[in-house]
Amino acid sequence: MTMKIIQTAQAPAPVGPYNQAIAANGFLFTAGQIALDPQTMTIMGEGNVEVQAKQVLTNLGAVLQEAGCGWENVVKTTVFLKDMNDFAAVNAIYGQYFDEATAPARSCVEVARLPKDVLVEIDCVAVLPT
């Protein structure tokens, strides 16, 4: 199996021993993205889940683009929420990137804590274009 590391300066550098994404066997597997500004590495929208969700999806989009993918290539996402009461607010932002007719499969879970105490984290799996 051939694996290719995907990295871009348009998304935050990893905050641990992992890569932004790995391309393997026709798929792209992204690391979870949080609301870090790629240039300053500071949290955007502290305490504001809408601002954080937008930054998360902006970061995720940059990783997808670096791999030659777009939102239309995404087949699965996982959304991690600090508080499930933010579900509707995150869905409103998420829906700006994925419409109901073409949205990928998704899991959404509430977790006790996320890196850097953010409110939302999202990762995805995409099919690489041929």
Swiss-Prot record:
InterPro entries: RidA, RidA_CS, RutC-like_sf, YjgF/YER057c/UK114. GO terms for cellular component: cytosol. PROSITE patterns: UPF0076. Coiled coil: none annotated. GO terms for molecular function: deaminase activity. CDD domains: YjgF_YER057c_UK114_family. NCBIfam families: Rid family detoxifying hydrolase. Belongs to the RutC family. This is RutC family protein slr0709.
